[in-house]
Amino acid sequence: MDKVMRMSSEKGVVIFTKSSCCLSYAVQVLFQDLGVNPKIHEIDKDPECREIEKALMRLGCSKPVPAVFIGGKLVGSTNEVMSMHLSSSLVPLVKPYLC
């Protein structure tokens, strides 16, 4: 869990993904379209992939990826991020991290 918390604080917006996950890609594109350059951690390329997945689940992710952190705090997965975007509450959160 310490590794995940450390990784989630490396940048203002951090996304844990898997390279083969289309939902992860969609979330990445959304943030890039908003003008944010998120830190991407492709956990399937990390030797500790299983431990990272378990830690993300313990933090409250219903699915391990994509897991989005803004300002070091877990926002959620695709559903939460898209809901925030549609309700116009995502942009104020990422405003400090715009490129």
UniProtKB/Swiss-Prot annotation:
GO annotation terms (biological process): cellular response to nitrogen starvation
Subcellular location: Cytoplasm
Described purpose of this protein according to its UniProt entry: May only reduce GSH-thiol disulfides, but not protein disulfides.
Keyword Cytoplasm: yes
Source superkingdom: Eukaryota
Keyword Aminoacyl-tRNA synthetase part of the UniProt annotation: no
Record-linked NCBIfam families: GlrX-like_plant (TIGR02189)
Keywords: 2Fe-2S, Cytoplasm, Iron, Iron-sulfur, Metal-binding, Redox-active center
One annotated Gene Ontology cellular component of this protein: cytoplasm
Amino acids binding [2Fe-2S] cluster: 21
Record-annotated Glutaredoxin domain positions: 1-99
UniProt source species: Arabidopsis thaliana
Protein name per Swiss-Prot or TrEMBL: Monothiol glutaredoxin-S11
GO MF, one annotated term: 2 iron, 2 sulfur cluster binding
Family as reported in the entry's similarity comment: Belongs to the glutaredoxin family. CC-type subfamily.
